[in-house]
Amino acid sequence: MTDLTLALDVMGGDYGPRVTVPATLQALHLYPSLHVVLVGNQPEIEHFLPKAESSIRQRIEILHTTEVVSMSDRPVHALRNRKQSSMRLAIELVRDGKAQACLSAGNTGALMAIAKVLLKTLPGIDRPALVSCLPAVNQKPVYLLDLGANVSCCSETLFQFAVMGSVLSEAVDKNEQPKVALLNVGIEEIKGNDQVQQAGQLLQQSPQINYVGFIEGNDLYSGNVDVIVCDGFVGNITLKTSEGIAKLLVNQLEKGLTKGFFVRLMAKLIAPRINSVLKQMNPDHYNGASLIGLRGIVVKSHGSADESAYLQAITLAVTEAQRRLPKMIEERLESILLDINN
């Protein structure tokens, strides 16, 4: 891995430096060529660094600021009035070429607003989209977008999301010709609102996208497709519902395995397999949503993420930076739009 720098808004999220700094130290151990800029309150950050090895400490820079975007800040307010916030300064490092990607667990709306203004969207992209992974029965990643950055979308925007999702699957998972579907209330061509139907027609006209049609909610986790596209209203509800069901299943499984002597004995015997299943079902295993469609890389972590989950988000940011995802999306989109116009 060539040297790369991540800018981390370590003050964002429910736990701030208590989680973000220890997780970053783990990432620095995993990636010897990784450098980080920790943006936030320096005394609070330093509190979690005394035990860091000198070789690790040399790859850490601290950019001090005491201003933070709160979870209650409206996006416009954060954009206009939080110009020295840890979130904004982290994004500015990407804009200025001092970091290849940034990560924040802070206010999603503010992150989108600030990132869009500072980094700008790629040519041919009207709006950035939030995208993340869903688990599937075949254990391969399935990308779902948009997850809430755009509550309502026209057909052209959905088409752009499909292109970006396809390129993401290719870049991150080395997936040739990823299968792309539109989330709908039925698989028949007559089903769905005008926006979804028109987006389907646009995708059918694009031979470079492996569009397979509509997909219903009960097929989300089948692994039959690689990219699922919808507007942010539907996507956010889908994601939160999925996370809620996963937590319920994990909780019920853990409770069931502690009832009775023989059940506990069997649970111990098959513990490795059970732990593997629980890990696959745990939403933390899929932490990290990418704000794609921008000229720079921005990754959003869950605000409630623990160290393990935050480390997953760092890993995602590193992967996208290594693959130069924005450049890949830009080149592919240009080729696809040229195909359609011809």
UniProtKB/Swiss-Prot annotation:
The keyword Lipid metabolism applies. Its main location: cytoplasm. The keyword Lipid metabolism applies. Pathway: Lipid metabolism; phospholipid metabolism. Its EC number is 2.3.1.274. It is found in: Cytoplasm. Keywords: Cytoplasm, Lipid biosynthesis, Lipid metabolism, Phospholipid biosynthesis, Phospholipid metabolism, Transferase. Gene3D superfamilies: Isopropylmalate Dehydrogenase. GO terms for molecular function: phosphate:acyl-[acyl carrier protein] acyltransferase activity. InterPro entries: FA_synthesis, Phospholipid_synth_PlsX-like. It comes from the Bacteria. Belongs to the PlsX family. Homodimer. Probably interacts with PlsY. This is Phosphate acyltransferase. It comes from Shewanella woodyi (strain ATCC 51908 / MS32).
